[in-house]
């Protein structure tokens, strides 16, 4: 990838005064584009925590989110920064209409792994472009990778490929993509990694039809209803962490749904634990 990456203020709106955006970056493999969004703390001479995150358009601005709901991450970060005195640089990569292939680290054997290519582009090209623009380094910075749904799979895979991202936040990972490949991949995580794994218990609404009519019934999952199916899949990921002696901190919400509102509640708690 030899594309020029440039940055500008995200908006003239004062609510986004510390948010910046890149030009569109073309992914020739899938004929689609991504953008880089980054949020700077008030003092960025030293960065305590970097969070590299997927679906960046859902973090700060409701007008760009897929479903009109956002993490409202700026308020979450200010709460954490004020309480703990540790700052955060957020680098979010936007997704696109081919998210289902760009965010699937476990394609069929005869298919190109566009997700791995995307992750490598992000870490080897997108991330350095932000650091160069800000003229900062990540020396003594806690490097975190985060994502939700398919982004939850991407966060795990990112740490496998680039173990400097020792802290992983995986929210409601979409385990059924290539299942059970993610279970088998957990063993490839660094033993120094820590994964904060979350799911809600009311996430089955995303499937539309009953899961027994969608997925192979011989999967070792709970097909009694869609909510239990989702929970059982994420629980199997947690069990794979345990059986492979990888550190995992698992949490759930009884009424948690598959949306940014529930994930925002979860990530506030996770960040409080993480730092």
Regions found by a protein language model. Name each.
Residues 1-49, 85-88:
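A domain-start/cap signature at the N-terminus of enzymes
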Residues 139-191:
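Primarily recognizes the serine-hydrolase "nucleophile elbow" in alpha/beta-hydrolase
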Residues 46-59:
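Short beta-strand element of the alpha/beta-hydrolase
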Residues 257-264:
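Catalytic histidine-centered segment of alpha/beta-hydrolase-like enzymes
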């Amino acid at each position: 990838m030899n594309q020029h990456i440039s940055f500008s203020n995200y908006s003239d709106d004062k609510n986004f005064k510390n948010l910046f955006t890149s030009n569109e970056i073309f992914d020739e493999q899938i004929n689609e584009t991504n953008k880089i969004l980054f949020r700077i703390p008030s003092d960025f001479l030293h960065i305590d925590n970097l969070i590299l995150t997927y679906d960046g358009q859902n973090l700060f601005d409701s007008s760009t989110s897929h479903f009109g709901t956002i993490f409202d991450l700026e308020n979450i970060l200010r709460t954490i920064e004020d309480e703990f005195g540790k700052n955060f640089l957020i680098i979010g990569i936007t997704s696109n209409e081919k998210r289902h292939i760009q965010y699937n680290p476990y394609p069929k054997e005869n298919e190109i792994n566009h997700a791995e290519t995307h992750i490598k582009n992000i870490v080897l090209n997108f991330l350095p472009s932000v650091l160069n623009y800000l003229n900062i380094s990540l020396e003594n910075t806690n490097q975190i990778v985060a994502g939700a749904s398919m982004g939850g799979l991407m966060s795990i895979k990112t740490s496998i490929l680039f173990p400097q991202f020792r802290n992983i936040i995986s929210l409601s990972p979409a385990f059924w993509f290539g299942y059970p490949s993610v279970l088998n991949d957990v063993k490839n995580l660094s033993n120094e990694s820590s994964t904060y794994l979350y799911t809600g218990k009311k996430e089955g609404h995303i499937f539309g039809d009953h899961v027994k009519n969608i997925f192979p019934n011989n999967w070792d999952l709970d097909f009694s209803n869609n909510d239990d199916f989702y929970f059982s899949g994420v629980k199997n990921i947690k069990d794979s962490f345990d059986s492979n002696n990888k550190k995992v901190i698992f949490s759930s919400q009884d009424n948690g749904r598959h949306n940014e509102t529930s994930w925002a509640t979860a990530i506030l708690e996770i960040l409080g634990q993480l730092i």
